[in-house]
Amino acid sequence: KFQSRMIVGFKKCLTAVGGCGGPLSRLLLKAGKSIFGDTSRVVRSGNWYGNDTAWRMVLDLNKCLFHFAGNGKPRTKPLKYCTLVDGIIAGEGDGPVAVDAKPCGVVVAGFNPVAVDTVCATLMGFDYRKLPVLKEAWKIENYPLVNYCPEDIVCKSNLQQWDRPFSQLQEREHLGFRPHFGWVNHIERSNIDPIPEKQLEL
């Protein structure tokens, strides 16, 4: 209650200050950023490479979705699932809120979210084995999310360079996405060059 009262009080104060003029309002915002940091440039939550809890939550929620019905009982039939990723104009950098647009002209689809995300991470220029949520998703034994190995994935594409088994896709050019600042230099595929920017124009 105290925290919510403080937030409401602060908003009222800012509203009153805003009525007094822009310079004072800007001064207060600048002071706030110097104390608390710019929201888009400060890691306040789990969005950094060392977080060892967020990926567990994501996988647990997916286990519940795929293996249990809404009433909490085990599913009698496997959940039918189709993943569609719109990467026509994707986002890179400080996501999911403050992304920079990245035109890629790519749509990815599949019937298993672990496989689709693994392929997407690879196309983006990331090593899925360095992303805990993907690396660990392939290892689950109790209530698994996927019943095959990454090497079993076969990608079908209208681009010859991506129309191949996943094991070969990992050795091909990628889209060269810039990761969130909390993940820079921790997830990139360093051995393969990105596709030149001019080839990504729509």
Which residue stretches match the model-derived regions?
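Extended, low-polarity segments enriched in aliphatic/aromatic residues
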Residues: 1-202
